[in-house]
Amino acid sequence: MSQSTPLRTDVVVIGAGPVGLSAVFQCGMLKLRCHVVDALEAPGGQLTALYPEKPIYDVPGFPSIPAGELIDRLLEQVAPFTPEFHLSQQVIALEAVAGAEPAAWRLTTSRGVVLEAAAVIIAAGAGAFGPNRPPLDRLEAFEGTSVFYMVSKREAFRGRKVVIAGGGDSAVDWAISLSDVAERVHVVHRRPKFRCAPESAARLDQLAAEGKIDLVIPYQLKALGGTEGRLESVTVADLDGAERQLDADVLLPFFGLAANLGPIAEWGLGVERQTIPVTQATCRTARPGIYAVGDVASYPGKLKLILTGFAEASAAAHNAFHDCRPGEALHFEHSTTTGVPGIPA
């Protein structure tokens, strides 16, 4: 059930990845208030959900920075502007507010939150992410207590018996990382070889040889054991059907994330190949007051880089200012002159 009174703000940013957070910062510098909606349970987009400890090399000023640390720094940067986050939900409906002055959009989320804003900045990347869930009976009973699809803090798994399922970078990287804190780490993969960086595969083999990781290959998940949402065991089966039971109190299935633009594709934005065409200079879409930035935005010569997305976020924010403050002049000034609004110089 939706709330009776819409939450009014200047800008709604759809997507809390690095480019979405950059858009929040740029809006804040222009004294525009933001609400942020994201389908994931924590800000950061792919950087948090898939590879928080992977280094990123192409952010200016950082020869190398872990993806999760970049998100932490972006969150620190937007904190003075107190954006309001609406996580674990999607925007499922968008409509123009009849008779609004200035013109406004009404957005409704999958949790019934209703927002009204003069501008919308879509920073949805490839779309709303959701995990590819293994087809196991009673899986839902353990989700959120013993089964998790992302790791935000590895300390939460200290002393735990962890089963990681999957054969890609996320599965291997977290197996390596959690081997330092977990009581036991089992890695279940249906193939004898892993699809990951060669250095990660070598490190995984080394830890397995040292007895710090148990490689359960080639096996697949078969069943979960436990009561009242508390996992006690994971049953796996090999290609011949022979079963093995693993003691476990945590299961981390890393089978990738499925991304889809979902309702965004129905908003009259001319979506092509899961991207939204925009005017490069402004990042405006085909509908006034709606902008797209980052990987979801497309124009001739587009480079899908974080750096490009940061520049697009700035362009979108400066143009959204005129939607939010019609008739008010925007005098461009460098941050070295203005400082950060609300923070003493």
Curated annotation (Swiss-Prot):
Cofactors (names): FAD
Stored InterPro entries: FAD/NAD-bd_sf, FAD/NAD-binding_dom, Fd--NADP_Rdtase_type_2, Ferredoxin-NADP_redctase_2
Disulfide bonds: none
SUPFAM superfamilies in the cross-refs: FAD/NAD(P)-binding domain (SSF51905)
E.C. number: 1.18.1.2
Oligomer and partners: Homodimer.
Pfam families, alphabetized: Pyr_redox_2
Positions bound to FAD: 38, 46, 51, 91, 129, 295, 336
Catalytic activity: 2 reduced [2Fe-2S]-[ferredoxin] + NADP(+) + H(+) = 2 oxidized [2Fe-2S]-[ferredoxin] + NADPH
Cofactor binding description: Binds 1 FAD per subunit.
Domain of life: Bacteria
Single GO term (MF): NADP binding
Keyword Flavoprotein in record: yes
Protein name as it appears in the record: Ferredoxin--NADP reductase
UniProt family annotation: Belongs to the ferredoxin--NADP reductase type 2 family.
PANTHER family, sorted: THIOREDOXIN REDUCTASE 1-RELATED-RELATED
